C-alpha cells in the first residue's frame, strides 16, 4: 500500500485537520471490507438507519473510527494512520452533509456515503463546498 503525509491531504483539502503525520492509502477492496464490518456493527447497535440523534456526522465519524481500528489490528504499521477521513460539505440541494473520504494514493480521492455504506460521487460544486475535513 502507498503512503502519504499531511501535505498531500492539505493539497486536496486545505482546511483539513490531521491528527497524524503519515498515512497508509488503503485499497478499494480493503475499504469495502470495512463497509461490511461497519454495516454489521451498525445493525448490532440498532443505528443503521438515519435518526435525528444518530445522523450523517455520527455515521461519518463512526466509519472513520472503524477504519482506524481495523487498520491498526494486524501488526505494527509503518505509518501513524490510515488515509480515511470525514468531510462536511454543502449538497447541491443546499443542505449540509457529512460523508467519508479516502485517499487511494497521493492524488486519487474517493468519497463514501456511510449511510449505505456505498461509494459516492460529489459534483464539482459539492467538492468545492467542503468546509471541514478531519483525518
Which residue stretches match the model-derived regions?
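A structural boundary/capping signal
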Residues: 1-135
Amino acid at each position: 500500500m502507498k503512503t502519504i503525509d499531511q501535505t498531500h491531504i492539505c493539497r486536496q483539502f486545505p482546511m483539513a485537520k490531521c491528527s497524524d503525520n503519515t498515512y497508509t492509502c488503503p485499497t478499494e477492496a480493503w475499504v469495502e471490507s470495512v463497509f461490511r464490518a461497519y454495516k454489521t456493527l451498525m445493525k448490532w447497535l440498532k443505528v443503521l438507519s438515519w435518526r435525528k440523534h444518530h445522523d450523517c456526522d455520527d455515521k461519518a465519524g463512526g466509519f472513520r473510527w472503524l477504519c482506524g481500528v481495523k487498520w491498526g489490528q494486524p501488526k505494527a504499521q509503518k505509518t501513524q494512520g490510515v488515509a480515511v477521513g470525514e468531510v462536511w460539505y454543502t449538497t447541491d440541494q443546499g443542505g449540509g452533509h457529512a460523508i467519508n473520504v479516502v485517499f487511494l494514493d497521493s492524488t486519487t480521492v474517493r468519497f463514501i456515503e456511510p449511510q449505505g455504506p456505498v461509494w459516492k460521487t460529489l459534483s464539482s460544486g459539492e467538492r468545492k463546498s467542503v468546509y471541514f475535513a478531519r483525518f
